[in-house]
């Protein structure tokens, strides 16, 4: 039995198995939407859960405006990642073709404007997109020099889906989020 268990573990290390963060079914996290209005911006966010053809998903839309030093809308969830054997995040998404972002905050991103981010582009069709942790870059700006260039996967405390950085109408759906 020990030999068999060893072979199973050896042939299927944890890094090859996905871990669901949110599937809108039996695994859920609490998403909180907000915009740059928390810092004086004028971007507007609408966020709600929808269902279409039997598939439940989160929907975020709104006008992103860079006026008043703004430029983002997002929905973010507190998470606790305790296993560093994963290579990245996988998101089931569709949208209006704009470039969107995943922002990760860690134990070291103590100031609200610090994060590690990576972009992805949507289409109008559902797709799973893999975003490797190696593609996440630390944010620039005030006090970002105190952040390590790479983040500690075990230190992840929140994940945000973000429309950011330019004037545009954001429209994105998310039906799943996993570690891979």
Model-flagged regions — what are they?
Residues 7-15:
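Hydrophobic h-region of N-terminal signal peptides that target proteins for export
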Residues 1-6:
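Sec-dependent signal peptide recognition
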Residues 15-180:
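Beta-rich carbohydrate-recognition modules and glycan-binding surfaces
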